[in-house]
Amino acid sequence: MTKVIEALSDWQSIRKTINDLSVGFVPTMGNLHAGHLSLLERSKCENTITVLSLFINPTQFNNKNDFKNYPRTLAQDIAMAEENGIDYVLAPTDDALYPDQYAYKITNSTINNQEAEFRPRHFDGVLTVVMKLLLLVKPTRAYFGEKDYQQLQLVKGLAEAFFLDTEIIGCKIVRNEFGLPLSSRNRRLTEDQYQLAQRFSEIFHSDLSCDEIKNALIQEGIIVDYIEDYNERRFAAVHVGDIRLIDNIPFAKDKKC
């Protein structure tokens, strides 16, 4: 039976009772979909206990409207956790997780490309909340999707830099039948925007060069933040209407921009 915990002191008491067990952790902002469920299933396969967090982290939004419009589906998410046999759900309040009112934060002073360039201070909020959650949950393993690939690499660096006793595991992107990565943002797309998002995915996954992809997307009416190759992967961030979508794929060495 899934136990839902709001008070962090309650969780801290519970955590002491499972010290001898392996604990898998999947941090999310809720609005769960099949991509999240794939992370949870892997955790269940590899650990005795699986913990899911549901927390819409205000400090990682550099756009107030984006935070305001983020889907809030707590009851639905808890029901999905119960259906999928998750042991514990952490659902803390903002004040509980930020008793310091965000006076203390984790930052990476060297990152300035891709999401760091287009979403100022975003990763400060991400790294800070991840650090708080990892210290609270003390997981054996924590699972992150590769859709947010830059975030995944930063979290791995965070765990290494601060000697956290947690293995950070990246999991493959879950896509729909058109190749579009599953994302909570997809649910905000109108029917016409969804068709355009599918075109983004088709063009991005083509054999075109970065510049050719940019031009093709612009011709479709899609606003491009970046299409670039970095460390043997191709990355994209675009706007379909007011919805921002990201994707990344590994590529062959002879197909760089």
Swiss-Prot record:
Keyword entries, A-Z: ATP-binding, Cytoplasm, Ligase, Nucleotide-binding, Pantothenate biosynthesis
A biological-process GO annotation: pantothenate biosynthetic process
Pfam families according to UniProt: Pantoate_ligase (PF02569)
GO cellular component assignments: cytosol
Subcellular location: Cytoplasm
InterPro entries: Pantoate_ligase, Pantoate_ligase_C, Rossmann-like_a/b/a_fold
Coiled coil start-end: none
Transmembrane segments: none
Enzyme Commission number(s) of this protein: 6.3.2.1
Cysteine disulfide partners in this protein: none
Pathway named in the protein's UniProt entry: Cofactor biosynthesis; (R)-pantothenate biosynthesis; (R)-pantothenate from (R)-pantoate and beta-alanine: step 1/1
Gene3D superfamilies reported for this sequence: HUPs (3.40.50.620), Pantoate-beta-alanine ligase, C-terminal domain (3.30.1300.10)
Binding site for ATP: 29-36, 145-148, 174, 182-185
Catalytic residues (positions): H36
GO molecular function terms attached to this record: ATP binding; pantoate-beta-alanine ligase activity
Role: Catalyzes the condensation of pantoate with beta-alanine in an ATP-dependent reaction via a pantoyl-adenylate intermediate.
NCBIfam families: panC
PANTHER family named among the record's database cross-references: CYTIDYLATE KINASE/PANTOATE-BETA-ALANINE LIGASE (PTHR21299), PANTOATE--BETA-ALANINE LIGASE (PTHR21299:SF1)
UniProt miscellaneous comment: The reaction proceeds by a bi uni uni bi ping pong mechanism.
Protein name per its UniProtKB record: Pantothenate synthetase
